[in-house]
A protein has these predicted regions:
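Short alpha-helix capping/helix-loop boundary micro-motifs
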Residues: 1, 25-31, 91-102, 135-139
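N-terminal accessory targeting/assembly segments
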Residues: 1-73, 78-81
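Short, charged beta-turn/beta-strand-edge "cap" motif at the junction between a beta-strand
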Residues: 11-14, 33, 46-51, 67, ...
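Conserved hydrophobic positions within beta-strands
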Residues: 17, 61, 112, 136-138
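Residue-level recognition of beta-strand microenvironments
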Residues: 20, 64, 100, 116-119, ...
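Short, solvent-exposed secondary-structure boundary/capping segments
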Residues: 24-29, 68-74, 125-126, 137-138, ...
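Electropositive phosphate-/nucleotide-binding environments in soluble metabolic enzymes
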Residues: 30-33, 55, 101, 107, ...
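P-loop NTPase nucleotide-binding/switch module
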Residues: 74-129, 145-188
Length: 188
């Protein structure tokens, strides 16, 4: 499928389908392709190129496809080895989740469920994911990693567990209710 992430050759290089013509695909490989040739195996992941949005994003240093350069350097050395596979954000690190919503609240996409104080000046808001609306049936503060459930929402399609991690396709714009003009610049 167009824009799906693929793994190329036995080295599992990261690529993306950028053109389809019949049963042939053109693939943009995001790593060094030396030594590759026609007929290499290609395995589709079935998902589009996406980024992980969660606490830990602000403190990280990433390459263009959100590979965590500091974690890669710690595990593999200063050179990025071809075909390595690591999670974009640290899925094990725990963050203190502070609830803003309460059980019984009616919420919809973009509403704040709580926050994580990611840095002394950055408060990372945890929002109701796109496409989710309903009543908060569970929400608890405490220490969680980004994949653990911090809230549950009863929707028309059943109960939905909410964690602090959202994966978002890079080629799809983020929805918003209104555009807010900046009140003061963030000087870094």
């Amino acid at each position: 499928k167009m824009y799906d992430v693929v793994r190329v050759s036995e080295k599992k290089l990261i690529g993306e389908i950028i053109e389809l013509r019949g049963d042939k695909a053109s693939i943009q490989v995001y790593e060094e392709t030396g030594g590759l040739g026609p007929g290499e195996t290609v395995e589709s992941t079935g998902v589009p190129l996406s980024v992980e949005l969660a606490p830990g994003l602000i403190e990280g240093i990433f390459d263009g496809i959100q590979r965590p350069l500091t974690r890669i350097a710690a595990a593999y050395g200063d050179r990025i080895t071809r075909g390595i596979s690591v999670t974009n954000l640290d899925h094990e690190k725990e963050w203190e989740f502070v609830p803003l919503a309460r059980e019984g609240d009616e919420v919809q996409a973009g509403d704040f469920l709580g926050y994580v104080q990611e840095t002394p000046i950055v408060r990372h808001k945890i929002m109701v994911p796109y496409g989710v609306a309903g009543k908060v049936t569970y929400i608890r503060g405490g220490m969680y990693n980004i994949t653990q459930t911090v809230a549950k929402i009863a929707t028309q399609k059943g109960e939905r567990e909410i964690c602090m991690l959202t994966r978002w396709p890079v080629r799809r714009g983020r929805p918003y209710r209104e555009k807010m003009s900046p009140e003061m610049p963030m000087i870094t």
